[in-house]
Amino acid sequence: MKKLKMKISTILILLLVFVTGCSSKKELKDGVYEGNYKDESATVKVVITIKDKKIVDCIREERDNKNNQIKDENYGKDDADFNYKQAQKAVKNSEGYAKKLVEVQDIEKVDSVSGATVSLKRFKSAVKDALNK
């Protein structure tokens, strides 16, 4: 019985150490970092400024890989009206991601906005690329 308790205790301690080690947040170093993410349909570039170990600014740019067009207020104008409206909904809904990152200081705490879920996945990947440099 003592051996079983000892094994269980050891496993629990190792599990606690592992979980604690995995949850520790990487300390940010001051500077300006650029990150990129590219998939078959879009490329995202972010420029993140760190000051006093905090994210103080984030600039995000997303481009359509088909025509290299920046996804802004003009994105989708050459398409049918429905496609333009859908494109603009995604653009509008994803605009807040950079601001939210500065606010919450953790990319995993930036929540998806309806109509811009794919943009968030791309943004998160670009941010992780920048912060891992």
Language model regions located:
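Compositionally biased regions
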Residues: T10-I11, S24
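Active-site- and interface-proximal helix/loop "cap" or "latch" segments in soluble metabolic
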Residues: K26-L28, E34-K133
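C-terminal motif of bacterial Sec signal peptides marking the signal peptidase cleavage site
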Residues: F18-G21
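Cell-envelope/extracellular anchoring and linker segments
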Residues: L14-L16
